[in-house]
Amino acid sequence: RLKSACEQVGVVPVIAVCGDADTGKSHLLQAVCHLAEQNQQSAVCVSMEELFPLGPDSLSGLEGQSVICLDDLDLIAGQENWEEAIFHLYNRVNDHGHLMVVSLSELPASLPFGLQDLVSRLSHGLTIQLGIYRDDDRLRILMARAEQRGLVLSDDVAVFILRRAPRKLADLLAILDRLDENSLRAQRRLTIPFVKSVLGW
């Protein structure tokens, strides 16, 4: 659903990706930007945590991108000036026929936003709720993250990692970070014996 909505920019005004901290929301937003670029569209993915110290003016001009991804948007809930700035950005994005994708820890109506017009706008498009990933989803995410890092991760090694790694996606991706660092340092490919030795499995 997310992929098809992203490929029809201008049809859905906003996509809200909602879920807990370890459900891979940031990874999904990065994938949305990557998909847009593959489709010859301009895209930007920004973290509200990084923008917050810069003030609401840092949002100006973002509507010029075809796809605008705002990660951790719930960080500005209750901040009146930020909420208004996001509301106006949404309207500008909509006027351009572009797409806004936001990630939130909960559904928009469940968060302490003061500006109800913003809540209604964020609820107006496609809402995707993320929960526990199935194993095949986790495998796909693991393989995609490895590819982004330039790591060669074979199917059998990926399945081996999945069988022994914690269920949380954040823990799984942290394991990949460790393997990446160690394989670079040792100049070794990711094999099952190497993974065992690094992780003590």
Where are these regions (language model features)?
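Conserved P-loop NTPase "ATPase switch" module shared by AAA+ and STAND
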Residues: 61-85, 89, 96-104
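C-terminal helical "lid" of AAA+/P-loop NTPase domains
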Residues: 159-163, 170-184
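Short glycine-rich substrate-engagement loop in P-loop NTPases that contacts/grips substrate
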Residues: 37-67, 77-83
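Conserved AAA+ ATPase "SRH/arginine-finger" region at the nucleotide-binding site
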Residues: 125-137
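Pre-Walker A adenine-sensing motif
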Residues: 1-8
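Short regulatory helix/loop adjacent to the ATP-binding pocket of P-loop NTPases
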Residues: 108-123
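Conserved AAA+ ATPase "sensor/coupling" helix adjacent to the nucleotide-binding pocket
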Residues: 125, 139-152
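Walker A/P-loop nucleotide-binding motif
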Residues: 10-29
